[in-house]
Amino acid sequence: MSMLGVLRGPRQVLFGAGQRHALGTVTAALGSRALVCTDARFGGTREFADLVGLLEGAGVRVTVFAEVLPDVPVHQVAQCAAVSTEADPDVVVGMGGGSCIDLAKAVAVVLTHGGQASDYYGELRVPGPVIPVVALPTTAGTGSEVTPVAVLTDPERISKVGISSPHLIPHTALCDPELTLACPPALTASVGADALSHVIEAFTAVRRPVSAALATERVFVGKNELTDTFALLGVRLIAGSLHRAWSEPDDMQARESMMLGATAGGFALGSAGTAAAHAIQYPVGAVTHTPHGVGVGCLLPYVMEFNRPARVPELAALARAMGAPADATPDELADQAIDRVAELLASVGIPSTLAELGLPADKLRWTAEQAFGAERLVANNPRQLDVDTLEHIVRAAHAGDRSALRQSAAPDLTSTKGA
């Protein structure tokens, strides 16, 4: 097998307790007129006021858009851009969860290149560099602070849509785990499940044949040597800290490990991409109105079970990273990986079935059909997917029956796009 490594990320990442205090200096080096994107909750906190003070103290004029909604409705891109027109920002700062950072990235595209957000849906449709973005996450989950994608919700489409381009990667990510200490247990669990899904789906994604054009023709190239390194780091950190961060919110060591794990997951997914769990969650979330992380967390063990025949070595490596004994056989370790993931997610209150999430039984086939429309995610799965196989996964996840997905390895189960 020819080795391939593809890794994309910010110009700089500052990680650690207290790194938020560099915000003023970092931003002032990029511009003098900042548009700050955040949500109403964080925008009303003392921490937010202090951060704005850092910007102003560094001589940066600040315009605040504090109305970011979960899953970023696409109309908010135009709304935010209109609010900032008079201020003429030359740097955009996203403060908050992944939605706040995603909006900052999408607005930077529109402010730079004009048009509507919908003009840039898909991969590689952003024509050039954008206004620099500084990302300051307050949750340990999406990894958006280092990724080349902004995910939006468009009422004209059932599933979420993405703007994917290396130009969307923030210039600077300030990852301060102290900002996650106020994250309540339910949100810690949801975003933590999302982070776990990122490292696992990136590590088990399709491996495409190596070519000189691969990284220029795709944003998400599939698993490779560099993303694998970040994925394994992420799974080790998240597996060892998610439950503690959920049950002991003031445990700073757990919060640090979760944020570093989530950022590692962002690096992994930012070049490798995610797969079936994300494809299925989009229509599930549209129907049940449940958080993205809860949905992908619910689905993840079932997708791992389905992909097991094509990814035994990878699942074994994940099990070892999660602390499984190294002397077990690869098949035993693969089973342990799936069991350990399911147990960890259950321990922080993630529902184990789609029925618990509220997906109606008469929507199972429809869910599979909609998931199949997420072509990028479907193509990134290590086993080939069609509507019937997606429905098989959905039905198993609805009933809570992982055993329905168990099969032995067979050559024809792996994707023809590369194993």
Name the predicted role of every residue range.
Residues R208-R340:
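Active-site segments that bind and position negatively charged phosphate/pyrophosphate groups
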